[in-house]
């Protein structure tokens, strides 16, 4: 739990090792298969989950992360979750021996200080191995849960000054070992939640991951591991090229946006989010230097992974929507978030309310900045709602 860990989690990853050569058509067929896997996994969860926030609001996301921790496919679900899944999964991947990874395993994570968003966003994921036992990728499925076992129902506590007030934290917890549900662990997780529907939600997430893992195993059997790895590399490289081609159309320069949160939950006024977007020959740098870093603020701390995700979610709205969502986007966009500011807080700061504010101010500031180079694609911030109103119901 440190800034150093954040740097490790966000560090660029190398392509997968493979001797296979692949053509555009084959690579796109496999990419399409990945998208189908994600769609089926997310749909499985949406239809099997017990809670309305998942089965009606569809606040969930399925994504595939490769064996190096790169986002291989982010396809279906809530947009910002697309870019959070990989960070939380990377923590488990970096510690796979510690957590005894193997075929048939399924894990749970929700830790804001280990690559996660806020506590209610539970990430369930399962590794995918080929017939030789080589790890090829990880299927992830993330969804917002209605409670986290914290002080207040829902996991949102306006006066919280640390994350422990908000609920139970899982850095990486094995739910299924070699295909067998660990009932003691499952019961422990369910018991630390106020809602009876939670058991059905977690069971649905496990099932959605297992369904997708089986589909990916079939894909590996059909095409072979080397070809699938080559397809992942090709797709990521293609996305990076398309990103750079789009960005290179913008005039070089630095474009800035500043947005204020009216006040935090303790009444402190005018909390600043500042963004500087620098375009330089096909490379985009988004720098949040100048964003508020007062340590006594309450209820306005967004996790590093969340902030990184919200930046990218807004950036891609200014680009061709047909570009495939994967790690190639991060290769073309450098994101700078100062350590200690509200967009990358110190360890153990409360995280729940950060997905409202400053998350929406981050996207708004990026939009204000990039509206100077792509005004035809700029959009109003529709997510900027009153935090106490939305969460608790106060007037």
Predicted features along the sequence, with ranges:
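Glycine/proline-enriched, intrinsically flexible loops and inter-domain linkers
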Residues: 2-103, 108-131, 135-285, 289-395
